[in-house]
Amino acid sequence: MGFFSSLGQINVWSLLRPIIESDLEVIVIALGGYVLAKKGFLPRDAQKVISSLNVYFFTPCLVFEKVGNGLNLKMLIDLSLLPVFYVIISAASILISFLLAKLFRLTPRQRNFATACITFQNSNSLPLALVSSLATTVKDLLWDKIPDDTPDKVASRGIMYLLIFSQLGQALRWSYGYRILLSPNQPEDPLPIGNRSWSHSDVNEEEIQNLLASSANVDGVQNSVQANEGSTVQTDSSAISKNDNVQVETSNEEVGGFGAASSKISKFIVLLLDFFSPPLYSLFIALFIAVVPPLQRFFFEEGSFVEGSITSGIRMAGQVAVPMILVVLGASLATDISKTEPTQEVRKNNDTRVIIVCLLGRMVVVPLALLPAFSLLSYFSEISTVDDPVFVVVIFLLVGSPTAIQLTQICQLNGVFERECAKVLWWSYAVFTPPNSLLLAFASLLVVKWTK
């Protein structure tokens, strides 16, 4: 009865309103991109240019302003447990995506895409709006360990939790997601046997042309060698022996000194730097500024010259990032729907399976697997953060949140799964998010009441 009396405190419309507002905000901007693409203003090449601009400039500006101004050293120390929760949630999501991919017989590339959709959730707009709404309407979210706790303090703590999770998600999304899961360098999936005749003949013709071109180049090189040296055989043999000597000398030098070790270290550094992305660089710089109070005051102190000029410019550029992502999302929907391919029917069937796995994993299986375990932890644990009622709400909304909109930006930039990503996001936000978010909000309040 206690739970139902606490539910009586909630105005259902006040909970539904931020959900509907967040969804309509996404749909309206994406619809603008859809119409522009249909009218021919945003062809595929233009979409890729916009995505590149966003990744290399606007998104780093957004990350810098949010992290540098929103975090500080004390906050990071107090909330040091949150990365552990994020690792557990991400690892469980990856495991679930692999199991679903095996069950639905997805190819390795499709499995990687599904893993990205299931692992990377929206931790900004939608959960933020819901937490802010619940904080002002539900008295049970007041924490008895904080004297004189108020709805404003509850909302501040909820936003702080979401901000930490959001930046952890940014780091994983722009490293593991950008460079591995959605990398453009993955091998292509084989077509079914019934459709191989078309692609096989096309590939053979291209291979023959490449071989003929390379053969002509080799002939040209041999003729020039004969003209200059007079004997192709002698030149080749002398070149071979010379190369052998050089290789032996080089290998001896590397074995004898530190050449091999330094070469491996330099290669590792190059690979590590290549693994990072512009938003990730921006995140590290912003974190450094956030944990050094003089630097944070220098950039973000209100009324200062730097805050009113440089920081204000960065903030203005960052505000463009999310609308541009949504415009490209709508444009990619329009472009992909009108796109025709020889293997369209086969790809359509495969797309349906991938989209089902993404939606099922992100919106259903992951919450069902993780939230009961977290509810038990919240009931029995003595950890202070876990005991915070608004933290329980944040975890519920985060675990069941739809796929991150930013994923379409990565797919567009790398040229992979653009159509599938657009469809996953459309179904997530337009169909499943309103009832799913409402159910998660009520379930989290039930757990809060149970643990008190």
UniProtKB/Swiss-Prot annotation:
Keyword Manganese found: no
Membrane topology according to the record: Multi-pass membrane protein
InterPro entries reported for this sequence: Mem_transp_PIN-like (IPR004776)
Signal peptide (UniProt feature, chain positions): none
Main location: membrane
Keywords: Membrane, Transmembrane, Transmembrane helix, Transport
Protein name: Uncharacterized transporter C5D6.04
Residues passing through the membrane, by range: 18-38, 81-101, 269-289, 317-337, 354-374, 390-410, 428-448
Gene Ontology molecular functions: transmembrane transporter activity
Family listed: Belongs to the auxin efflux carrier (TC 2.A.69) family.
Name of one Pfam family that matches: Mem_trans
Gene Ontology annotations for the cellular component aspect, listed alphabetically: endoplasmic reticulum; membrane
Cell location: Membrane
Keyword presence, Transmembrane helix: yes
